[in-house]
Amino acid sequence: MNDEKKIYMNSFFFLSLIFSFFENSFEILKYGAYDKVPDSNNLQYRFGTGLGYIGNFWDDANMANLSRKAGYDTQRKKLPEQHLDDWGYYIELDDAKTNTKLGILDVVGYLATPTRGHSSNASSNPELCYPANLYEPIFLNNGSVNPNNYWAYYVNKTVSIYKDYIKIWETWNEPDYTKEYSQVSNWKTEPPDPKILTHWYGSIFSYIRLLRVTYEVAKKADPTCFVSTGGLGYPEFLHAILRYTDEPNKGEVTNEFPYKGGAYFDCDAYHQYPQYGVTDIETGEKYDDNGSDMLAKKVVILKKNHEYILKEFGFDGIKYPKKIFINTETGLNSEKSSSAIGGDLVRRNWILKLALYSILYDVKQTHMLVLADDGTGMGDFSKLWETKSIEEGFTRLKSSSKGRLALQKIHIGKFIYDKEKTEEFKKSLPKNTMGIVLKRKFTKEDGEEYYGEYIYSAWIYCEKEEVGGEIEFELDLSFNPLMIDWEGNEKSIKKNSIIKLSSTPIFLLNSSFIKYELYLILLVLLSLL
């Protein structure tokens, strides 16, 4: 071979290596959530609750009815295998239908708790131990779900029965829970130690396997559903999910285990309780204080952290589809104690601001842990077990929870963040205040009061603690607004009125002199011009 030919062949080989490197580096995967996620355009912001257990008169149907009256319009519904196996898989169907009739929609179905016989540790609490037989084939040769893969069989039956009433399937509960906080930072480079994952007791690879089984089975039963992670807390655990496959030894990519964990969920469900601080991993800013703005921001900054990790792995809406985000557990005590932050005013303000910040940060749902407590905890109602009717129960609604009724009144979930109008509005506000403008995305429904196309909200910003007193200033709006306070009281005011701001948000709506019917007439007349 002459020198010229050698040079040509070597150059060709070198270029082939470069091409192969770049081809692998920029490979676009086309499977599962790497390829597509369900359309989320019809998902409006919703407040939900996990209900909890009260007893006596308060079964799930009555609690759901009461929760709807308290301003909730979604729910985190627990459907454990153990419960369905004991009582029959259809046991929750009537309650699921009741939710739909009440307007409790886009419900989260919480998949968890194998039977003892289907747990990896039958002598322990099955709620805290991963399912057995996860690595059995998911499907048989004829395409049906393999009954020897216990989790697959349970998911298939559950999704098939409840798919008309459940929108999002949450996969387990807090698999990343640990008290060995010093080890968490290692999870960005090493697999978590199964021994310290005390709500899972399995490897990260087996949790990815759980996601894969859930995803492949649920999508076959209902291609329109969302599959979510199981209430994650640590961004480092999410990083590990995205870094590894379900290959059981090292989480490597193989022919049998071709995709990493990001392929197997559409929705990032996370948990954040605002008594715990959060650090923004992108900016390094710490969120440790306990004013209501800071408490609300803690909940959404954890979402921002998860989103940052997802973008690192290409889930940015360009390379791969974006995930949606829901917060399936949070809460704040209605009374302060030596071990927990809380109080009537701070909780009231936190609930209102949490809705506004969640819409700002595009969190689709926020779920409170429980509906009721002894009067001091995170519930909305006090000592419901003493009551025997929905009407009587409603009288136990805590003062700090009543702001959600104002949010329900103005249908805040039908609005989205308007960045341009927010920036303009904030320029007109005094120092130490906060403002957000929302614009309507979803249309008015029959029988629904119309409150216009925009919601302007403003309040005194509370970082370290709740700020007392009021700030007086002159409005500078282009319309005469209807002002609604946290109790739902209405007052029509002028666009240049002098108003007072406190730490509790007020809502200014462009609907004080124009009702929906007139609005429709004007649209028709304009179309004829």
What is each stretch, according to the model?
Residues 9-25, 524-529:
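Classical Sec-dependent N-terminal signal peptides that target proteins to the secretory pathway
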Residues 28-159, 163, 170-171, 176-200, ...:
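N-terminal substrate-binding region of glycoside hydrolase catalytic domains
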Residues 30-31, 357-469:
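Aromatic- and carboxylate-lined catalytic core of secreted/periplasmic carbohydrate-active enzymes
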Residues 33, 118-148, 178-204, 240-260, ...:
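Surface-exposed intrinsically disordered loops and tails
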Residues 46-51, 73-80, 106-112, 167-171, ...:
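Structural recognition of the beta-strand scaffold that forms the well-ordered cores
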Residues 54-67, 151-158, 241-257, 348-355:
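Short, acidic/polar
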Residues 204-348, 361:
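Noncatalytic carbohydrate-binding groove/subsite architecture in carbohydrate-active enzymes
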Residues 445-529:
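C-terminal beta-sandwich/jelly-roll accessory domains of carbohydrate-active enzymes
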